[in-house]
Amino acid sequence: MTNPKEKTPMCLVNELARFNRIQPQYKLLDERGPAHSKLFTVQLTLGEQTWQAESTSIKKAQHAAASLALSETTLPKPAARQTKNHMNNNPEAAELHGNTFTSSRHSAKGSITPTVELNGLAMRRGEPAIYRSLDPKPLPNQRANYNYRGMYHQRYLCPMLKTFYVQLTVGNSEFYGEGKTRQAARHNAALKALHALRNEPIPERSSLNGEANRGPEEDKDANKSEISLVFEISLKRNLSLSFEVIKESGPPHMKSFVTRVTVGEFTAEGEGNSKKLAKRRAAAAVLQELRKLPPLPVIEKPRIYIKRRPKNIIKASPEYGQGMNPISRLAQIQQAKKEKEPEYVLLSERGIQRRREFVMQVKVGEETATGTGPNKKTAKRNAAEAMLLQLGYKASSPVVEKTGKRGENPDWDEQNSGIADQTSTPKGILHLSPDVYQEMEASRNKTVPAPAISYLSSKEMNQASSSFFSTSVSQSCTAAIARELLTNGTSPTAEAIGFTGKNLMCHSSTVQPSKQLEYLAGIQGLQVNYSDRQSGNDFLTCLTLSPVQMTFHGIGSSLEASHDQAALSALKQFSEQGLDSVDGSLMAENGPFEQAKLRGEKADNKQANSGTIAQDCKDSKAVV
């Protein structure tokens, strides 16, 4: 349908059905073809007649069937409605139009008056339509008719109808209209303007904006508007620039603006149906004058060297740039354990604007550690370093205070000279360091089971205390003593070795784990330190064994219970150090429940064979 007001075939079929008092019926008969190109077959029934049509959609098939029904039906059709020949139901307007507007145009255009149509055409052309009323023509002088009897008798002198005249201006063209009313005169003038301007081409915007006939040297400014070019020229030549709307006229729906632009000594005006268009035309007019000015001399400006302010952020020690990054190392350790990677959380920011201090927290399983630094990166690094120490690993790199410039401290230079530069790796890829790789291989060969309740794995225990155990009682003896203390409360192995220390004497039936740990520490020559703090109704204990720098944690409702839990974790850690590879592999295959069961059986068997273990421990001590 070219005209949206034209009725569709289905609408005409409905009118035909209402006229004959029947009900039309559409039925979908078939649907075939692929999903992207289906064909639908629709059947239309009107009374006893049927028609079929197919198309690519159901609606199109219905319209096709309705078109067939309209052309082939034998039912009587209703009479067509007559179209209105009067515009806006105004007989005067229809009389003014004469034969210009046919009935078909009325049906297509509806109630569009000539003035409205002319306003649309004028807006497309960018020219305002301005109406101005004119004074009527003077009437001829008529003398009164007096009869011979001396009496005034008026014959056939009825008052003449008044005629209105209107002047219409569209751009540079003027048109005149007349009518019995002022509105009829406006319509008459608009009709004349439509006849004259309808076939004329619409002027191009390039000629309106003053963009035609540009030279090749202006091609570089093709994407810039005239207003931008005027601003650039005024800035380069140090000229004052101002835009001012000096006139505003016309009706509210078709206003006309006049804008004046002043650039130094040059002035120009522009007119348009919007302030933007008037401003652009004024800029285009003054731009023609500015381009006639002589070119500016080329002046090479000297380069300005800006001295950068020194950074007031104190950098961390250069030792942190060497060796293994603690963040990467902690991530590698968690990957080797096949556990969840560390989680970093920013807790707080302290300090003034230029002396910030960030507090970062890292969480590995149930362990947490914090680190501070002047920036988030350093705080994250310190938190990872603290977590490594808390897990029982050595520090990634020693923190050395920088006391002077490079070259002033020979010890610092010699220490850094032996460290190779760290190679850059792609983001997201962590290569295993040699020490972590060796630990993984050693743990695979030994197949030592992980502790059930502890903060240090057996692999970490080997790394932290291997040097100490090599000069004291062997690891198997230490594990045997710890198992005996956990099982019986006393250690026949320690007595067989000949340890003359503090005896485990307690009036109660059981010995506290803290006392047992002190007894074992006396055998090993370790120092036990407790660090306590209270959180609500619970007590938190941090147990440290030196000089091996092992840390265990405990929590309890009382200070004594918290100490006992931390000591119990340490004893369990020591008790799992001496298991042989066969038992370890068996435990790894059976799982946690079987490990606990096997551990109880081993404890009973080890008690019976304490004499043999004691003899082995004596031999190992003698060798040392």
Curated annotation (Swiss-Prot):
GO CC terms of this entry: microtubule
RNA-binding found in the keyword field: yes
All copies of domain DRBM, residue ranges: 55-122, 142-228, 254-321, 354-422, 540-604
Keyword Transferase part of the UniProt annotation: no
Listed Basic and acidic residues bias regions: 214-223, 596-605
SMART domains: DSRM (SM00358)
Keyword vocabulary terms for this entry: Microtubule, Repeat, RNA-binding, Transport
SUPFAM superfamilies, per database record: dsRNA-binding domain-like
Compositional bias annotation for Polar residues: 415-426
Annotated segments matching region Disordered: 197-223, 401-428, 592-624
GO molecular function: RNA binding
Role description: RNA-binding protein required for the microtubule-dependent transport of RNAs within polarized cell types.
PANTHER family xrefs: DOUBLE-STRANDED RNA-BINDING PROTEIN STAUFEN HOMOLOG 2, MATERNAL EFFECT PROTEIN STAUFEN
Swiss-Prot/TrEMBL domain comment: The DRBM 3 domain appears to be the major RNA-binding determinant.
Protein name as it appears in the record: Double-stranded RNA-binding protein Staufen homolog 2
Provenance organism: Xenopus tropicalis (Western clawed frog)
Lineage: Eukaryota, Metazoa, Chordata, Craniata, Vertebrata
